[in-house]
Amino acid sequence: MLQPKRTKYRKVQKGKMKGNSQRGHELSNGMFGIKSVHEDGMFLTSRQIEAARIAATRFMKREGQLWIKIFPDKPITKKPLEVRMGKGKGAVEYWAAVVKPGRIMFEVGGVPLSVAKEALRLAAQKLPCKTKFVVARDFEA
């Protein structure tokens, strides 16, 4: 699973996910990608990202290259079951990536359009947000 090696603080506040993605909304490495088009921002866990990565690479049969453009750097905490409120914040349960609308999550290069489209469709099925397949501007079929 993806998670940071070190962090400045063990726990962080929840924060607000207002507006669209300010950066990472254009393809930078590959010719194809999937973009979040969910109406609100959301958290993607490291397990969801890993499941999507495995689904895409398995279909591509390790040809081409897959770039993961998001990283789960936000610790999500949870208190144990049947514990009363208060007495501090719970322990870190998992790591999540904050994904706002318009953010490119995965990019693929070095494979034909049909293979990339199907690989990213399988990856998108593993994610809890609405996605859109995008193609680079300088791509010629």
Swiss-Prot record:
PROSITE patterns: RIBOSOMAL_L16_1, RIBOSOMAL_L16_2. Part of the 50S ribosomal subunit. One of its GO terms (cellular component) is cytosolic large ribosomal subunit. CDD domains: Ribosomal_L16_L10e. InterPro entries: Ribosomal_uL16, Ribosomal_uL16_bact-type, Ribosomal_uL16_CS, Ribosomal_uL16_dom, Ribosomal_uL16_sf. NCBIfam families: rplP_bact (TIGR01164). The gene is rplP. The keyword Ribonucleoprotein applies. GO terms for molecular function: rRNA binding; structural constituent of ribosome; tRNA binding. The keyword Iron does not apply. The lineage of its organism: Bacteria, Pseudomonadati, Bacteroidota, Flavobacteriia, Flavobacteriales. Residues 1-29 are annotated as: Disordered. PANTHER family: 50S/60S RIBOSOMAL PROTEIN L16 (PTHR12220), LARGE RIBOSOMAL SUBUNIT PROTEIN UL16M (PTHR12220:SF13). Disulfide bonds: none annotated. Keywords: Ribonucleoprotein, Ribosomal protein, RNA-binding, rRNA-binding, tRNA-binding. One of its GO terms (biological process) is translation. Residues 1-17 have a biased composition (Basic residues). This is Large ribosomal subunit protein uL16. Belongs to the universal ribosomal protein uL16 family. Binds 23S rRNA and is also seen to make contacts with the A and possibly P site tRNAs. It comes from Flavobacterium psychrophilum (strain ATCC 49511 / DSM 21280 / CIP 103535 / JIP02/86).
